[in-house]
Amino acid sequence: MHVIKRDGRQERVMFDKITSRIQKLCYGLNMDFVDPAQITMKVIQGLYSGVTTVELDTLAAETAATLTTKHPDYAILAARIAVSNLHKETKKVFSDVMEDLYNYINPHNGKHSPMVAKSTLDIVLANKDRLNSAIIYDRDFSYNYFGFKTLERSYLLKINGKVAERPQHMLMRVSVGIHKEDIDAAIETYNLLSERWFTHASPTLFNAGTNRPQLSSCFLLSMKDDSIEGIYDTLKQCALISKSAGGIGVAVSCIRATGSYIAGTNGNSNGLVPMLRVYNNTARYVDQGGNKRPGAFAIYLEPWHLDIFEFLDLKKNTGKEEQRARDLFFALWIPDLFMKRVETNQDWSLMCPNECPGLDEVWGEEFEKLYASYEKQGRVRKVVKAQQLWYAIIESQTETGTPYMLYKDSCNRKSNQQNLGTIKCSNLCTEIVEYTSKDEVAVCNLASLALNMYVTSEHTYDFKKLAEVTKVVVRNLNKIIDINYYPVPEACLSNKRHRPIGIGVQGLADAFILMRYPFESAEAQLLNKQIFETIYYGALEASCDLAKEQGPYETYEGSPVSKGILQYDMWNVTPTDLWDWKVLKEKIAKYGIRNSLLIAPMPTASTAQILGNNESIEPYTSNIYTRRVLSGEFQIVNPHLLKDLTERGLWHEEMKNQIIACNGSIQSIPEIPDDLKQLYKTVWEISQKTVLKMAAERGAFIDQSQSLNIHIAEPNYGKLTSMHFYGWKQGLKTGMYYLRTRPAANPIQFTLNKEKLKDKEKVSKEEEEKERNTAAMVCSLENRDECLMCGS
């Protein structure tokens, strides 16, 4: 059997040569568990005569990846094989690679189609010695296999389908793309990115340094007008933004309801549903940047709108197709008045914005007065029990995980943009809360700090380093506002006037584990607070320094910060004594700040996978999980747990099988000691009340909002109701992003049992269930404290 080498020569397949190549990449790994010869044996079984060395390396990497559940070092080895393969297939010198990307000729039409901007190439060539020598290629070897494969699939630029960039090239491209001629700043950013202290968001990594640097993740729109022109102008904006790879939040509360009079045609409106189906089809048609991600629109509606019940059904799995829009995402923008009326079991009036105008333009007391005046004037279209609508909301969430829950009054009352007007919606992921109008499309550029990195070897937390890196991130995101490509002019106008940014986090759960703090412990709760105090402090200080150089943002005057009111003041919270807030407030009073908003913990799904961290602010959902790559699915064990079990001599095949059998939980495995059971509780074993409490405690230092998922293994209407009311009373802006559940029953058994039921029995069962759910919901409203104790 022979192998074809990269230069075209043929050579006999030699077992020892393959083993030796793998052995060389095993430095620093735990050789008690990693066995290069075992990988070689498996590789040789899959070979055929005429295999190329590239295919051989790919097979070796995949083989190592399949052994990851034996030990996480196999994932590192798999990545090293794959990275070493990529290094052999790509040019080393950064400036050469950038020239190749610029000189690209499209094979379909023979035209010059540069993949990087001429301005980026010119800067690289003018500074090539410094930039080329600053790159440290060994850092490519620190990715695990699944992080590297994610980069390879979607992030590294390709020439004719073949990857041309190495990960380090991409990070330097991004750094130069942001900082242009400021080479010192570019190299500083490159080092922080490549050492994994933080990461920019996916659109920034995709597009920085290219001809169309659309670096923003989030866009928020409100309807231009309740008219055919307004609806379709807004739709066009959505299409243009989605084409450029932006996720979208759209406020639709101003659109007239079903049956409302249309003066221009002397007809009646069809309401929200047919309009949203048009938006649904646009989302399907226009994906985010050529198949990178599907188009994604979140639709925000206030619960007084007459079409609210139909809105809650739009994502359901059953029902008439023409009453569904399953490719959209749905969110409620909830005034406090609705929550109060649900709590006290009062009536709730549904209205049409055409007949009761302005409700979406006011919040708080002003909203309550206007709403009550419309009720008094008899302009109401329908009256329902507030709890009847609440039941429909809970029912939809139990079935579909949505709508998202955001509290309109908290979002406005605690916003530094409240001087601009009423904020009408959030974004696709519920962490961005920014002002929109018919002339302004809100935008946010994102980055996330890898919180696990700031845990020292002595198990202390390096707040000083966290503040320093936060300041670099602020400067980067602030620069992006000026160099960004905007898909619509209204986005450019908004972003340059208010200059908001969104700094998030990833690896909070990893940081707790490295500090040896169980997620619910008092120590973790204090660290959670101090991490966000530090990020907010560092971000404000950096933004103030920028204002000193460049002046405050255009609409600064009249904002809460301009009056000395910071986010924690709006929550009536006193920070810990970690930082000197008095000095910072004095500095801000003198110079102002450059950015209206700063902090917004987002989901971090893709970038956390690249860096090998747990997502965002989330606890671990399981201690064993599946990672999908193009070549298949791989099971991964939580690497921290595996390290702990290995050190205590408890890691073996049988242990792995027990964890899999327990769905990733270790709580019922007798051999595992209690201290590890506390440390490795999954989200299903952590009190959701604690999760909400920690969200509120960090919320005092988050001037936008946070993507906060609620996990209830088997939700009932009582549990869910008490969760929502607890979050609302804690003052959260986002009460819930997704409701994550686990199926309670085996669906096959469930189907079989259902089949046997007669229609009559089925109807009575459904009625019984509705009664039971209503009773649970009402019980939780009447006995909130007790209900939370028995809930999650």
From Swiss-Prot:
SS bond list: C218-C444
MF terms (GO), sorted A to Z: ATP binding; disordered domain specific binding; identical protein binding; ribonucleoside-diphosphate reductase activity; ribonucleoside-diphosphate reductase activity, thioredoxin disulfide as acceptor
Domain ATP-cone: 1-92
Catalytic activity: a 2'-deoxyribonucleoside 5'-diphosphate + [thioredoxin]-disulfide + H2O = a ribonucleoside 5'-diphosphate + [thioredoxin]-dithiol
Gene3D superfamilies linked to this entry: 3.20.70.20
Modified residues (Phosphothreonine): T751
Classification via SUPFAM superfamilies: PFL-like glycyl radical enzymes, R1 subunit of ribonucleotide reductase, N-terminal domain
Residues binding GDP, per UniProt: S202, S217, N427, E431, T604, A605, S606, T607
Site entry: Important for electron transfer: Y737, Y738
Entries under Pfam families matching the protein: ATP-cone (PF03477), Ribonuc_red_lgC (PF02867), Ribonuc_red_lgN (PF00317)
Effect caused by changing N427K: Found at heterozygosity in a patient with features of progressive external ophthalmoplegia with mitochondrial DNA deletions; uncertain significance
Known EC number: 1.17.4.1
Annotated consequence of substituting R381H: In PEOB6; uncertain significance
Keyword presence, Oxidoreductase: yes
Cell location: Cytoplasm
Membership in a protein family: Belongs to the ribonucleoside diphosphate reductase large chain family.
SUBUNIT field: Heterodimer of a large and a small subunit. Heterodimer with small subunit RRM2 or RRM2B. The heterodimer with RRM2 has higher catalytic activity than the heterodimer with RRM2B. Interacts with AHCYL1 which inhibits its activity.
Disease implicated: Progressive external ophthalmoplegia with mitochondrial DNA deletions, autosomal recessive 6: A form of progressive external ophthalmoplegia, a mitochondrial myopathy characterized by progressive paralysis of the levator palpebrae, orbicularis oculi, and extraocular muscles. Ragged red fibers are seen on muscle biopsy.
Annotated protein name in UniProt: Ribonucleoside-diphosphate reductase large subunit
Species the sequence originates in: Homo sapiens (Human)
